[in-house]
Curated annotation (Swiss-Prot):
The gene is murA2. The active site is at residue 116. This is UDP-N-acetylglucosamine 1-carboxyvinyltransferase 2. Pathway: Cell wall biogenesis; peptidoglycan biosynthesis. It comes from Streptococcus mutans serotype c (strain ATCC 700610 / UA159). It is an enzyme of class 2 (transferase).
């Protein structure tokens, strides 16, 4: 078993670069299956989810070459083999293979999504869209079988009953090679959706409206190869900015797109965080007295649910009392008990998190229950006096590229220990 061991209380300063967006690349890689030639992605993060996707693509017959943060994928040898078990089950993003395999072969057998346990995240909206486009859906044990029964997918008018990033992306991918026009109403607006649409359009798709609540796709017969730069990871950027404010003595976070983080940065400014925002970076000064604030997550462009946990250790340094309410994922409170173990005045009451500060944290053995909870515990461990040992670190390595190396370069005393 691997653990992260942190000896906290060290002054952190310097520069940290944000990697490519995890939530983009986990959809970009499956979407490449639709191309009839080589696609190269630049800015690919070094995370375990990408390693799993590479293994899956190779198993299916794709040729994959890695060169630094570039990934060259030739999908021409891909076969529609059933994938009910194996690494596919560890990925939440496994559902993006539904749309890409349907679009290329008209059929798919893929294991049900895995990933972090954050409460109900149903795939009903995905299946509703596929059915509207002419696919049949059935369950085979722990796998999903989809088929067009030998017919091409047909364009459809699809209204998303709730805003869903995954369902919006999946529908967009499937519709790219469907016959006719597909309209997605009440579409999610996240930057990652624009990123996937950009790749598909560069491959020859006709998609407009990505980033708005109505997306229109005119299906095409063929998609070709291209080269694509993955957008910076706004969640990683926010995590490092919050970390810098909590424990830094002058940290510059680079490869940041401010427009993707406006609601997050606005909340930091409300707290009194001093920072300098430049074209593609944020410099965070050493902080003095911060003010407690309340946070309510909402779909983009609101405060991102994925940043609710990473900002929590920073909130614990503030003076006063505040609340956090996550309206997206009801079970995103598992970090609270772990932070309380470190001495934080924080609890869950009536479906929301209540905290009071300022707090002085002490090192303790803690467990990462999901990806973003793990990020919160890393920051808390860096803030705390003494040693913090984090278990279940595979969650953290799923989404934060080279996190140990990046933090060590800032002056942290942090390492992965094998047992």
């Amino acid at each position: 078993m691997r653990k992260i061991v942190i000896n906290g209380g060290k002054p952190l300063k310097g520069e940290v670069a944000v990697s490519g967006a995890k939530n983009s690349v986990v959809a970009l890689i499956p979407a490449i299956i639709l191309a009839d030639d080589i696609v190269t992605l630049d800015g690919v993060p070094a995370i375990s989810d990408v390693d799993s996707l590479i293994d899956i693509m190779t198993l299916m017959g794709a040729s994959v070459e890695c060169d630094g943060d570039s990934l060259k994928i030739d999908p021409r040898g891909v076969k529609d083999i059933p994938m009910p078990y194996g690494k596919i089950n560890s990925l939440r993003a496994s559902y993006y293979f539904y749309s890409s395999l349907l679009g290329r072969f008209g059929r798919a057998v893929v294991g049900l999504p895995g990933g972090c346990d954050l409460g109900p995240r149903p795939i009903d909206l995905h299946l509703k869209a596929f059915k509207a486009m002419g696919a049949t859906v059935s369950y085979e044990g722990e796998a999903m079988r989809l088929s067009t029964e030998g017919k091409p997918l047909k364009g459809a008018h699809i209204y998303m009953d709730t805003v869903s990033v995954g369902a919006t992306i999946n529908t967009m991918i499937a519709a790219s090679k469907a016959q006719g026009r597909t309209v997605i109403e009440n579409a999610a607006r996240e930057p990652e959706i624009i990123d996937i649409a950009t790749l598909l359009n560069n491959m020859g798709a006709h998609i407009r409206g990505a980033g708005t609540d109505m997306i229109i796709i005119e299906g095409v017969e063929k998609l070709h190869g291209t080269r694509h730069q993955v957008i910076p990871d706004r969640i990683e950027a926010g995590s490092y900015i919050a970390l810098a404010a909590a424990v830094g003595e002058g940290i510059k976070v680079t490869n940041v797109l401010y427009e993707h983080l406006e609601s997050f940065i606005s909340k930091l400014e409300e707290m009194g965080v001093r920072m300098t925002i430049e074209e593609d970076s944020v410099f965070v000064e050493k902080q003095d007295k911060l003010k407690a604030v309340s946070i309510k997550t909402s779909p983009y462009p609101g405060f991102a649910t994925d940043l609710q946990q990473p900002i929590t250790p920073l909130l614990l340094t503030a003076v006063g009392r505040g609340k956090i309410r996550d309206t997206i994922y009801e079970k995103r409170v598992n970090h609270v008990a772990e932070l309380a173990r470190m001495g934080a005045k924080i609890s869950v009451l009536g479906g929301q998190i209540i905290y009071e500060g300022p707090n002085e944290l002490s090192g303790a053995p803690v467990k990462a229950t999901d990806l973003r909870a793990g990020a919160a515990l890393v920051t808390a461990g860096l803030m705390a006096k003494g040693q913090t040992v984090i278990t279940n670190i595979e969650f953290i390595l799923r989404g934060y590229s080279d996190i140990i190396q990046k933090l060590n370069r800032l002056g942290a005393d942090i390492e992965i220990v094998e047992e």
